[in-house]
Amino acid sequence: FFVSRGVACPLMLKEDVVSGYTAGAGEIGHTVLSVNGELKCVDDLGSEGAIFAKCQEAMLAGRLPELKERMQKEGHLAMEQILEVQMQGDDEVNAIIDQAIGYLGIALANVVNLINPGYVVADSCLFSVEKNRQRLLEAAKGNFFGLNEEEVQIVFTPFDRFRGAKGA
């Protein structure tokens, strides 16, 4: 379960990556969730891109001054900056991330409930913060069906920005 600019959930069966008919299987970011009666892609709700967009919107409205200062100093917005501001206790950044991870947890639960894996590997800069890992576990397990909560192990791997490129 890989979260970056988008959300992917590559599927492996034994030691083989499962491929779809025309492309790779597991593009969970392109699946939809109903939010207040409106259908939205998981990428638009829980990806780093979604978090960036909400933070940028808040900065344009004059909020998140600490994040804006960091962004201007670095010349660009990065997930690491957002996480630093989150760890400093910024309520709005915490709310943005909490909501995004809530959607990611629902998406992950959908995958688990569909394929019933023995374990899931979660990888994201977002999960380098312990409370974000706990939030994902809470959101996912709260939507697991039956025994999945006890049976499915979610493993958080140390984040490596280039893991996707190395795997390709």
Predicted features, each with a name:
Residues 1-41, 48-49, 167:
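Phosphate-binding/catalytic loop of phosphoryl-transfer enzymes
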Residues 35-168:
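ATP-binding/phosphotransfer module of carbohydrate and carboxylate kinases, centering on a glycine-rich
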